[in-house]
């Protein structure tokens, strides 16, 4: 699908230009991951990971796929990338971004919500 909004285009270009954000997006494209999993896989400092994940969620590039509760009663979120692939094309003065949605995480969340 062709993306038209300037806000989402700017967010995607910013995320792809930041190597740490790319290291967060890559493992969450195919499987939901917790912040701890992302930190372990990317060997990124905790504060950096939390800050970048918050930014990605605020920009709608990452969604909370699930909220889990441990046996001790602690909550943690599993994150999933909104896009499966992104193609950026710059021609003359126009930036065109095509993105393939990630198996529509919004529909999955809606289905889970109504199945409760």
Predicted regions and their residues:
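Linker/hinge segments immediately adjacent to helix-turn-helix/homeobox DNA-binding domains
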Residues: 1-5
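Short, cationic-aromatic polyanion-contact patches
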Residues: 6-19, 34, 65-90
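Short, structured protein-protein interaction patches enriched in aromatics and acidic/basic residues
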Residues: 45, 57-59, 69
């Amino acid at each position: 699908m062709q993306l038209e909004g300037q806000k989402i285009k700017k967010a995607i270009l910013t995320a792809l230009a930041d190597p740490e954000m790319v290291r967060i997006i890559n493992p969450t494209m195919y499987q939901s991951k917790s912040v701890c999993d992302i930190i372990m896989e990317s060997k990124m400092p905790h504060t950096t990971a939390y800050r970048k994940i918050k930014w990605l969620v605020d920009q709608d590039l990452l969604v909370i796929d699930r909220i889990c509760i441990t046996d001790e009663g602690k909550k943690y979120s599993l994150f999933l990338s909104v896009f499966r692939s992104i193609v950026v094309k710059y021609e003359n003065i126009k930036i065109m971004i095509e993105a393939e949605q990630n198996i529509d995480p919004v529909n999955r969340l809606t289905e889970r919500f109504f199945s409760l």
